[in-house]
C-alpha cells in the first residue's frame, strides 16, 4: 500500500478544484490569507467527495445534526447528483490521510435554486446513519431566525480550497481557517456594481445572501458549501454557506454566502430542531 505522502503527491498531480455544477468561475472552492486550523477547532467541518478514480474533494459542508449536513446547492446540482456518487468525510485535519467516508441516503436541494447568483444556493445531505457526537465531531448551532451579523462580528470561514486564485492547496492538504470581516449587504451590492455596466437598480446581493471578506482574507475555489461561523455571546453560529464571488480576495469583491437564517424554515422541514 502506498504511503500517505506518495498518495498525496499522486493526488496533487490530478487535483483540480472542480465542482459538478456549471459557472465554476464564480464558485468558491479555498482560503486566502488564512492559516492551518488547530486540530481541536471546527468539529462540524466536513468534506464532500465525488466518486471517480478516487473519492475527490469537491466542496465543504457542515454537520448541523448527527444525521444531516448543510452545503451549497451548486455542489450537488442543478441536476441533483445521485446519493451513491457522494460521500461525506467528517472533520479531518488533512484531506485523504485518514478517510472514513460516510454514505449519503438522500440529497435535498432547495427547489428555487438555479445558479448561485440567483440565490437559494443551499442543500441538505441526509447521512445513512447518524454519527457519534464527540469532542472531535459536533454539529454547529444554527442561528435564530432574526439573528443578524453586523459589521464587527467575529466570523471565520474554513476549508480545503485554493490558497489563491488558481493555486490549489498543496500537500498535506491541511484544513485552513481565516477570519473575515462582515460587509453589510447594501455596501457589498455597491461594491459589486463597481466596474460593471449593470444598472444600480439591479440588485446583485440579495436578501438571502451575506457578504464577508476583503483583499486580504476570503474564501476561494474548494471552499464552496463550507461554513461561515460567527461568535455571538460565546456561541458559534453558522451565519452562512460559502456560495460565490468574483475572484478570490479581490478589491471590492467580498465573498458571498447563503444566509442561513433566511432558510431556517426550509431546513427544519427536513432536519429536526433537536437531535
Curated annotation (Swiss-Prot):
Transmembrane segments: none annotated. Keywords: Disulfide bond, Glycoprotein, Hydrolase, Protease, Secreted, Serine protease, Signal, Zymogen. It holds the Pfam family Trypsin. Its main location: secreted. It catalyses: Preferential cleavage: Arg-|-Xaa, Lys-|-Xaa, but with more restricted specificity than trypsin. It is found in: Secreted. The active site is at 74 (charge relay system), 121 (charge relay system), 224 (charge relay system). Its EC number is 3.4.21.59. One of its GO terms (molecular function) is serine-type endopeptidase activity. This is Tryptase. The lineage of its organism: Eukaryota, Metazoa, Chordata, Craniata, Vertebrata.
